[in-house]
Amino acid sequence: MIGETYPFISEEYTQGSDVLFFVFLSQGERVVPKAIGFTPIEKHNSKFYNWGFGDLVTNEKTGEFEIDDETESNNGDVKTVFYTVVSTLSKFFEFHPEATVHIEGSNTQRTRIYKSFINRYWGQIEPYYDVRGYASGKIRDFEPGTEYEYLLISRKKT
């Protein structure tokens, strides 16, 4: 299912905070540090793990690293970056096999991109993962071609 990916230069699981964090270098037209984070959130009275990714930047006020999910790098390697991000899902479920991952883009266009990836690879995703979408105030089983505000992914029970 997944094409070429970048190697991770850092993988970190912080048990006390329940956060899983990956760092890699996008090596397109420039070298851009990228980060992927799975962090616990609560939405509609349910616990999920937000799957966030973007450029790894330093907060000018605190000096701490954070994920900038609004900048568009336009680095010429979008497929490799996207495949690298997707590759972290199976690693996440090794730590949290019963969890549900929440996917929502920082804007509508990005959420559509994530949905189109699932549409394209649905035949390869569906045997392993349960995918649901939130629309019109309800969580429903994923149907290719349907618009959703956000997506939820969990590992299928074996």
Segments the model singles out, each with a brief description of its role:
Residues M1-T158:
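Non-catalytic substrate-recognition and accessory regions of acyl/acetyltransferase enzymes
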